[in-house]
């Protein structure tokens, strides 16, 4: 069970054992098929995945704060909230490389003193962090999305250096900075 379940809005069924997740999904899919298909069809059921955790190969994390005017956070949106962010340092749907990159980026962002982009005020720098890891090659691509309003080359240089120093299972294939 994911330790962030309940607060984090990223997953729906992480509070259930995998077998219960499968049963629920199978019931939902079977119901949709029954309603969508006219006539008889062969139902083969839902096949379990051999990978039950750390199965995501791409994630987009958001910058924000965990509560109004709180410290900068980097993670997923809180359940039911478009503004508040949950730091997901122990997210179960990504592997350890994602967590290391997430922690490194959050630490560098906090040390920089730069602010997250505040949607209501239209101020700040940090928007999103995208991480992608190829399943077969384990090549990792990281993309930091920021605003264009701040010249933060010193932060970017420090952040890239820290990322390249991480001990990862995968191989860092690219580090991007997207201004948006």
In which residue ranges do the predicted regions lie?
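Accessory RNA-recognition modules of RNA-modification enzymes
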Residues: 1-180
């Amino acid at each position: 069970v994911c330790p962030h379940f309940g607060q984090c809005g990223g997953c729906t069924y992480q509070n259930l054992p995998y077998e219960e997740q499968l049963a629920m999904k199978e019931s939902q899919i079977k119901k949709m098929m029954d309603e969508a298909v006219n006539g008889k069809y062969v139902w083969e059921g839902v096949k379990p995945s051999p990978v039950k955790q750390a199965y995501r190969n791409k994630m987009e994390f958001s910058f924000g704060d965990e509560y109004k005017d709180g410290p900068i956070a980097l993670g997923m949106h809180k359940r039911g909230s478009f503004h508040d962010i949950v730091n997901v340092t122990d997210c179960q749907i990504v592997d350890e490389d994602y967590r290391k990159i997430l922690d490194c980026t959050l630490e560098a962002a906090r040390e920089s003193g730069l602010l997250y982009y505040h949607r209501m005020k239209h101020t700040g720098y940090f928007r999103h962090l995208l991480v992608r890891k190829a399943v077969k090659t384990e090549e990792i691509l990281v993309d930091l999305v920021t605003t264009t309003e701040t010249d933060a080359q010193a932060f970017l240089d420090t952040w890239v250096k820290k990322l390249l120093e991480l001990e990862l299972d995968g191989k860092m294939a690219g580090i991007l900075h997207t201004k948006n």
